[in-house]
Amino acid sequence: MTDSNQQSELSKRQIDSVIALYSAGQYQEAINQIKILNDLYPNTPFLFNLIGACYKSLGQLEGSAKMFETAVNIKPDYSEAHKNLGITLKDLGHLDAAVESLNRAIAIEPNYVDAHYNLAITFKDLNQLDDAVKSYQKVIEVNPNFAQAYNNLGNLLKDLGQTDEAIKNYQKAIEI
């Protein structure tokens, strides 16, 4: 969740403090602390990304999306914020916009497993099964020990009538 280039002015103690609150599920307290830090260090993409994650955890998806958008507007090459925005847009039902955001994350970081994985899920939701298959295959190429990707790929291949390939992916998921 941290990127040392983004929060170079923030102290490690400040960063650790808000991450500890987030990790402990104390999202509102984390938001309060981040707002204070944001006043001290305005336009820090890391802070907007983290507050977006807090809002998302609280189920405040619209607010979450706005924070992730702010982060990527400040730092257009912030792959994690693009990925987070994509996931949130998917959760909001804005699937085409989600694909765009996830693809931006991948353009910045081509082997970004989480972005490829969420892109595959979004393609499936769009019923673009061939694209979903390709995305899961990329996930597996980059991380061959991602059991859920094999399982999900198996489900897609089964739906596409490719039973033998589906079985191979299920077996691989079980092996892992």
Task: Give residue spans per PLM region.
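TPR-adjacent "capping" and linker segments in tetratricopeptide-repeat scaffold/adaptor proteins
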Residues: 1-13
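Conserved alpha-helical positions within TPR/SEL1-like repeat arrays
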Residues: 15, 19, 46-57, 80-91, ...
